[in-house]
C-alpha cells in the first residue's frame, strides 16, 4: 500500500502535456520545418564547394534561395507567428540565411582562389565580418520594406563573379564596395515586399534567376565531360550579359527609388 502511494506521488510529479497538438499548430510547425530544410541544402552546398563542384554548389544554393523565398509568405498566410509565439521563425531564417547567403559564398570565393590567395582570404574576411554586423542590426528594414544598406546577398554577388570572371582586382573592388555599402544608408530592393514597382521588380528578379539557371544548365552540360570545371568558361556571352544587366538593375533600383520617392507610387 505504501509502495502504491509512493508511486502515485511520483507520477503526480511528472509533468503532463496540458493539451494535444492542434492541426493549426502542426501546420504552422511544418513551415518551420520547411525553413529548417535550408540548413540541409546548405550542408549539401558546402560539400560540393569543398570538392570544387561549383555548379552543384550553386544549384543547392539556388534551391535554398527558393525555399527562403516561399517560406515567409506561407508563414504569414498561415499566421505562424501568432499560432506558435514561442518559436522564432525570424531567428531560424536568419541563422540559415547567414550560412547560405554569406558563409558558403565566402568559402567558395576563397576556395576558388581566382583572386589569388591573399585577396581571396581578405575578401572572405570582409564578407563574413560585415555580414555578421549587418544581421545584428534590428533596423535593417525601412517602413516601405526596403533594405537599408547592402543586404548581404553574397550568394548572388559571388555567383555573378564566378560567371562573369571580371579579373581579380575588379572582383576584389566589388567585394570592398559591397562591404562598405552594407553600412551606408542607401536603400536596396526587396522584390516581394516593396509595393512600388513590384511587378517590374519581380519580373527582373525572375529574369535574373532564369539567366542564372541557364548558366548552371550550360555548366552542367559541360561538366558532364569534366566534373571539376571553371563555371565562367562554360557560360555563353548572352547569358553573362543577361545576368549583368538584371543584376545591376536589382542592385541600383532601390537607391533610385529612394531618391525619387514618387517613382512607382499609385496616384491618389
Curated annotation (Swiss-Prot):
Bilayer topology annotation: Multi-pass membrane protein
EC number(s) given by UniProt: 2.7.8.24
Any one GO BP annotation for this protein: phospholipid biosynthetic process
Reaction equation(s) it catalyzes: a CDP-1,2-diacyl-sn-glycerol + choline = a 1,2-diacyl-sn-glycero-3-phosphocholine + CMP + H(+)
Database matches in InterPro entries: CDP-OH_P_trans, CDP-OH_PTrfase_TM_dom, PcS
Location of the protein in the cell: Cell inner membrane
A GO term from the CC aspect: plasma membrane
Residues in compartment: Cytoplasmic: 1-27, 75-88, 134-145, 190-203, 262-268
Principal place of residence: membrane
Transmembrane segments: 28-48, 54-74, 89-109, 113-133, 146-166, 169-189, 204-224, 241-261
Keywords noted in UniProt: Cell inner membrane, Cell membrane, Lipid biosynthesis, Lipid metabolism, Manganese, Membrane, Phospholipid biosynthesis, Phospholipid metabolism, Transferase, Transmembrane, Transmembrane helix
Coiled coil segments of this chain: none
Primary enzyme class: transferase
Keyword Ribosomal protein included in the entry's annotation: no
Pfam family, one: CDP-OH_P_transf
Gene3D superfamilies from the UniProt entry: 1.20.120.1760
GO molecular function: phosphatidylcholine synthase activity
Record topology, Periplasmic segments: 49-53, 110-112, 167-168, 225-240
Names of the cofactor(s): Mn(2+)
Entry's family note: Belongs to the CDP-alcohol phosphatidyltransferase class-I family.
Protein's job: Condenses choline with CDP-diglyceride to produce phosphatidylcholine and CMP.
Protein name: Phosphatidylcholine synthase
Organism: Mesorhizobium japonicum (strain LMG 29417 / CECT 9101 / MAFF 303099) (Mesorhizobium loti (strain MAFF 303099))
Gene: pcs
Amino acid at each position: 500500500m505504501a509502495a502504491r502511494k509512493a508511486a502515485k506521488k511520483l507520477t503526480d510529479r511528472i509533468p503532463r502535456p496540458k493539451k494535444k497538438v492542434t492541426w493549426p499548430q502542426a501546420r504552422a510547425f511544418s513551415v518551420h520545418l520547411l525553413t529548417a530544410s535550408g540548413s540541409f541544402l546548405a550542408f549539401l552546398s558546402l560539400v560540393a564547394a569543398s570538392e570544387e563542384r561549383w555548379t552543384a554548389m550553386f544549384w543547392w544554393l539556388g534551391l535554398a534561395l527558393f525555399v527562403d523565398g516561399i517560406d515567409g509568405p506561407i508563414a504569414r498566410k498561415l499566421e505562424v507567428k501568432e499560432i506558435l509565439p514561442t518559436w522564432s521563425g525570424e531567428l531560424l531564417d536568419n541563422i540559415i540565411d547567414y550560412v547560405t547567403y554569406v558563409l558558403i559564398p565566402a568559402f567558395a570565393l576563397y576556395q576558388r582562389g581566382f583572386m589569388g590567395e591573399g585577396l581571396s582570404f581578405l575578401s572572405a574576411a570582409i564578407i563574413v565580418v560585415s555580414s555578421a554586423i549587418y544581421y545584428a542590426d534590428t533596423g535593417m528594414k525601412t517602413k516601405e520594406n526596403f533594405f537599408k544598406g547592402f543586404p548581404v546577398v553574397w550568394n548572388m554577388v559571388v555567383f555573378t563573379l564566378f560567371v562573369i570572371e571580371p579579373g581579380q582586382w575588379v572582383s576584389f573592388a566589388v567585394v570592398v564596395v559591397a562591404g562598405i555599402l552594407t553600412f551606408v544608408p542607401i536603400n536596396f530592393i526587396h522584390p516581394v515586399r516593396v509595393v512600388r514597382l513590384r511587378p517590374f521588380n519581380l519580373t527582373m528578379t525572375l529574369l535574373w534567376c532564369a539567366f542564372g539557371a541557364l548558366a548552371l544548365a550550360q555548366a552542367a552540360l559541360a561538366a558532364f565531360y569534366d566534373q571539376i570545371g571553371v563555371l565562367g568558361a562554360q557560360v555563353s556571352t548572352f547569358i553573362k550579359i543577361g545576368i549583368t544587366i538584371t543584376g545591376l538593375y536589382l542592385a541600383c533600383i532601390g537607391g533610385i527609388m529612394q531618391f525619387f520617392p514618387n517613382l512607382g507610387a499609385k496616384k491618389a
